[in-house]
Design a protein with these regions (language model features):
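Extracytoplasmic c-type cytochrome modules immediately beyond a signal peptide or single-pass transmembrane anchor
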Residues: 26-133
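N-terminal signal peptide c-region/cleavage motif recognized by signal peptidases
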Residues: 16-21
């Protein structure tokens, strides 16, 4: 029950944030950079906790895995609006803007993989979770390889 409340709260909060954020433009490019980096930091934290389970460094706990997958899935749509024209910088490579179609396709692929990961995590099927985690992590890696400064 706590997990359902957390997911409901997180989803409602995200919808409110995305609706407001989509309407508002960032005042300064630095604001967009900070916003997207903050979203990615929270996602990376939750992803890292799941990764520890997949690697056998932490015990499998269905509720914890489901919670972290829900966090990542809820946040996955948010950072992309902060990569608009004039927001170059941070850890993003120029290819984000020069090859924006490829970047957009990579972001959509990641969001689909994260949705699958969330579905698998919520099901409680450990093997399905691990398989989906691997697929989702590959989409993250692919985007990092192509679009994030080393």
């Amino acid at each position: 029950m706590k997990l359902q409340k957390l997911i409901l709260f997180t989803t409602a909060t995200t919808l409110c944030i995305s609706a407001g954020s989509a309407l508002a433009q960032f005042q300064k490019p630095e604001d967009a950079i900070k916003y997207r980096q903050s979203v990615f930091t929270v996602m990376a934290n939750a992803f890292g906790k799941m990764g520890a389970v997949v690697k056998g460094e932490a015990p499998y706990n269905k509720d914890e895995v489901a919670k972290n997958a829900a966090i990542v899935a809820t946040l996955a749509p948010l950072p992309w609006q902060a990569f608009g024209p004039g927001t170059e910088g941070g850890k993003a490579q120029p290819a984000v803007w020069s090859d924006n179609a490829k970047f957009k396709a990579a972001s959509e692929k990641m969001q689909l993989a994260v949705a699958d990961l969330n579905k698998a995590a919520q099901s409680g099927d450990v093997e399905s979770f691990k398989k989906s985690f691997g697929a989702a992590s590959q989409t993250c890696k692919g985007c990092h390889d192509d679009f994030k400064k080393k």
